[in-house]
């Protein structure tokens, strides 16, 4: 039987993978992907704890995070597309060009 610890371990591993991606990558698009992995890891943790405590608060938080992540993707992807059209690069080091 899969217990709460298994879900929390998977959640923690996914969060660490996302955090490593945030710290190691220089591509803006990969930073967005890493952020989504981290948010999904948090969702797994919330839903697992919610299931084992028979409380719906964790599932409500997970739905809230999913809606926030969807808006982040919509706005962020639009900004990334505009950034690529203007500078022909998705490198995070080229963000210094935005300084006024």
From Swiss-Prot:
The chain crosses the membrane at residues 1-21, 28-48, 64-84. It catalyses: a quinone + NADH + 5 H(+)(in) = a quinol + NAD(+) + 4 H(+)(out). InterPro entries: NADH_UbQ_OxRdtase_chain4L/K, NUOK/Mnh_C1-like. It comes from the Bacteria. Keywords: Cell inner membrane, Cell membrane, Membrane, NAD, Quinone, Translocase, Transmembrane, Transmembrane helix, Transport, Ubiquinone. Signal peptide: none annotated. It is found in: Cell inner membrane. One of its GO terms (biological process) is ATP synthesis coupled electron transport. Pfam families: Oxidored_q2. Its EC number is 7.1.1.-. It is a multi-pass membrane protein. It is an enzyme of class 7 (translocase). One of its GO terms (cellular component) is NADH dehydrogenase complex. One of its GO terms (molecular function) is quinone binding. Belongs to the complex I subunit 4L family. PANTHER family: NADH DEHYDROGENASE SUBUNIT 4L-RELATED, NADH-UBIQUINONE OXIDOREDUCTASE SUBUNIT ND4L. HAMAP family: NDH1_NuoK. NCBIfam families: PRK05715.1-2, PRK05715.1-3, PRK05715.1-5. NDH-1 is composed of 14 different subunits. Subunits NuoA, H, J, K, L, M, N constitute the membrane sector of the complex. NDH-1 shuttles electrons from NADH, via FMN and iron-sulfur (Fe-S) centers, to quinones in the respiratory chain. The immediate electron acceptor for the enzyme in this species is believed to be ubiquinone. Couples the redox reaction to proton translocation (for every two electrons transferred, four hydrogen ions are translocated across the cytoplasmic membrane), and thus conserves the redox energy in a proton gradient. This is NADH-quinone oxidoreductase subunit K. It comes from Helicobacter pylori (strain ATCC 700392 / 26695).
């Amino acid at each position: 039987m899969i217990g709460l610890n298994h879900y929390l371990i998977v959640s923690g591993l996914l969060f660490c993978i996302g955090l490593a991606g945030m710290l190691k990558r220089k591509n803006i698009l990969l930073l967005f992907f890493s952020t989504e992995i981290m948010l999904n890891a948090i969702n797994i943790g919330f839903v697992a704890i919610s299931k084992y405590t028979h409380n719906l608060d964790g599932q409500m938080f997970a739905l809230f995070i999913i809606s926030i992540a969807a808006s982040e993707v919509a706005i962020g992807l639009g900004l990334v597309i505009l950034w690529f059209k203007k500078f022909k690069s998705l490198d995070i080091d080229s963000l210094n060009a935005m300084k006024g």
